[in-house]
A protein has these predicted regions:
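Extended two-metal-dependent nuclease catalytic cores across DNA- and RNA-processing enzymes
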Residues: 67, 93-332
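Domain-level signal for Mg2+-assisted phosphodiester chemistry and nucleotide/NA-binding surfaces
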Residues: 1-114
Length: 335
């Protein structure tokens, strides 16, 4: 078994808890931002955050047996901004005064994990989602081994298959997502505090394309089309054969055809265009990366850069428990 961490999720989750200790209830937002700036620049407080990151990291890994490799992926500026200027605008238009210090601390965490020998994957133009997908292909199709992705990003559920599962180690709820056929197996594998849920990964993708996502600035295909309507749509198209090895346009046509029939829409071209846009923004599939073959500074496409990153890092670490001793964790020194 191999494990991939969504590094941004892991960092944000831990940071949100750590940051509460350095804010005051009666302070203004501006005052609390300044307090966070000071905390992120303080060497001792940086060490507290780094130790917490390592402890949470180990706690997640130690729930699994016979782990071979552990990788961590971290975001860079997304290629999707070239596609849509306002991509994730709602999330990025306001950045706290501590933003640069936050990124600096993320870089410190990244460098520390690299020094410890873990695979740390970061590619210009690629979001963590993109790298999670590319690494999942390597672990499951090249090595033909099981993979668990540790993340709180529900979008990643669209790549779940018989060999890929998802573990959400939220501080409030521990959830594990897998194909329905492996629910019993994983239920017996875990302690009782982990909730196991079987999901249909293809329908996860359909939901995002049809229902949209305001956090990613992805519009809904039809106003007033709610969850109840989506469930009826799934019933309407069932039974269906999931399209395999198709282009972005072919997948968009498959969805648009059925959506227009279900809604009795006559605006097929408009619906098709919107489905195509939504697919390009959300679908984790090689077809997307091939179709939009953006060139980067080194003259290579994003896909080639991601594949090169896998080839460069795939052999860098063989995981043997425990990854860190207590001395490693509490001796983590930020210079």
């Amino acid at each position: 078994m191999n494990i991939i961490f969504d590094g941004n999720w892991h960092f944000h989750k831990t940071f949100s808890i750590w940051s509460m200790y350095y804010q005051k209830k009666n302070a203004t937002p501006e005052e609390n931002e300044q307090l966070l700036c000071e905390a992120l620049r303080d060497k001792e407080k940086q060490q507290v955050l780094l130790r917490k990151l390592l402890i949470d990291f180990c706690a997640a890994i130690n729930r699994f047996k016979n782990v071979n490799k552990v990788a961590i992926v971290i975001d860079s500026s997304s290629w999707r901004y070239r596609f849509h200027d306002d991509y994730k605008y709602a999330l990025t238009r306001v950045r706290g005064a501590y933003y640069k210090d936050f990124i600096n601390m993320l870089n410190i965490f990244e460098n520390y994990m690299r020094k410890k020998g873990f695979i740390v994957s970061r590619v210009m133009g690629a979001e963590g989602d993109d790298l999670l997908y590319i690494w999942s292909i390597y672990f499951t199709q090249v090595l033909e081994e099981d993979l668990v992705i540790v993340t709180g990003d529900s979008d990643i559920r669209q790549i779940i298959n018989p060999q890929i599962s998802l573990f959400c180690n939220n501080s409030k709820n521990l959830k594990f997502f897998c194909i329905p056929e492996r629910v019993v197996e994983w239920t017996e594998y875990f302690d009782t505090d982990v909730m196991i849920e079987g999901v249909n990964s293809f329908e996860i993708m359909l939901y995002k394309v049809i229902m949209g996502d305001t956090s990613d600035n992805i519009p809904k295909l039809k106003k007033g089309f709610g969850d109840a309507a989506f469930r009826k749509f799934i019933q309407f198209i069932t039974p269906y054969t999931k399209p395999e090895n198709v282009s972005v346009i072919e997948m968009a046509q498959w969805i648009a055809d059925r959506f227009c029939k279900f809604t009795k829409s006559t605006n097929y071209e408009e619906i098709l265009g919107q489905v195509l846009f939504n697919l390009n923004m959300t679908w984790l599939n090689l077809s997307v990366y091939n179709e939009y073959n953006f060139q980067y500074e080194n003259g290579k496409s994003l896909l080639m850069n991601m594949l090169d990153n896998v080839n460069e890092n795939k052999g860098s670490y063989n995981y043997t428990k425990p990854s860190f001793t207590l001395e490693d964790i509490y001796g983590a020194i930020i210079k």
